[in-house]
C-alpha cells in the first residue's frame, strides 16, 4: 500500500507532521497470497479494493489470464461455526436471581480526565452510577430496573493516561520531571479506580476489561489488569464479584427465561479503528460486521496491529457467532442488528453495539439478555432512562 506507514515515516511524530487519518489510495491493489507465493487479483471484477484489508482469510475461485493476473469468479470468507446449541454455561459462580436479566455496559470511565476539574460533571455522573446500582435516592421505576442488573461491564479506558505518555514509543519525548508527574497521576487514577470498583462490586458482579489505549508496548490479545493494582478489591476478586478480564472478552451468560445462554464478544475497539484506517470503511458498526463476515477480529495483525506471535493457533480467528458484539466507542451510542449465516443454512441475528463514551456523554447501556432489547441510561444531573 502506497500510504502504509514505515519506521521512517514514524519521524512525523518528532517533527509535528500532520497525522494521516486514512492509509488508502486509489492506486491500491489486491493480491492473493499463500505459502506457495503471491498473485495479483483482477480488481475489475465485483470487488471493492478498499473494503478489503491485509490478512483476511479468504478463498477465491477463478483463473489466471495471460498477464498472470488472477481473474475472480467467486470468493468465500472463512466459515464461522455456530455452537449456540452447546450446554448452557453461566459465568457467575452463584445462582442468579430469577428477575436479573440486564447487563449494564459502561465505556471509558476515564477517571482522572483533566476536563473533570472544570465542571465536575463526570465525577457527578460516576456518583450517580453508584447511587443507581445501590438503589439509593432513585424513583421506583429506576429502582425496579436497578434490581434487575445481573452484571456491570466496564469497557475501554477506565483511567485517564496523558497522550504524552502514550506516544513515548512513537518517537516523542518528555522531560524527566514531567514524566514523573504523569506517572504519579496514573498511579493516583488507578487508586481512585480501585476504591470506586470496591463500592460497585460490593453490590453487583463487575467485569473490568483492559484497554490497549494508554498501554504502550501492549499487544493484542491483552491480559487482564494485574491484581496488584486493586489492593482494596482483593476480597472482591477472590469472591468473584470483581473479575479482571482479558481483551477481547468472550463470555456466556445464562438467561433464566429462555433457559439457554447468550454468547457475548467484546473488544476495546482498537482493532476496529485499525480496520477503518486501512480501508474505506468509515462506520465502526460496518467494520464490526466485516470482522464477523471475515471470521477474524484483527486481520491486519501483525502487519499494522500489534499482537503476540502465536504459532499453534490464531486466537483472533472466530470459532462461534456471538449473540451480541460490542466495542468501546469514542462518541455517542450506535447499534444495529445484522443477520449472519449459521451452520445448516440457518440464520442468526447478531446485535452490534458501539458503546457511548461515558466520560463525555455520561451514558451507560442496558442490554436485556431475554429479548435483546437495548436502553440508554443517562447519569447526568437528572438520572434518566431512555428506550433506544
For every predicted segment, state its role.
Residues 1-388:
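Extended recognition/assembly regions associated with phosphoester-bond processing machinery
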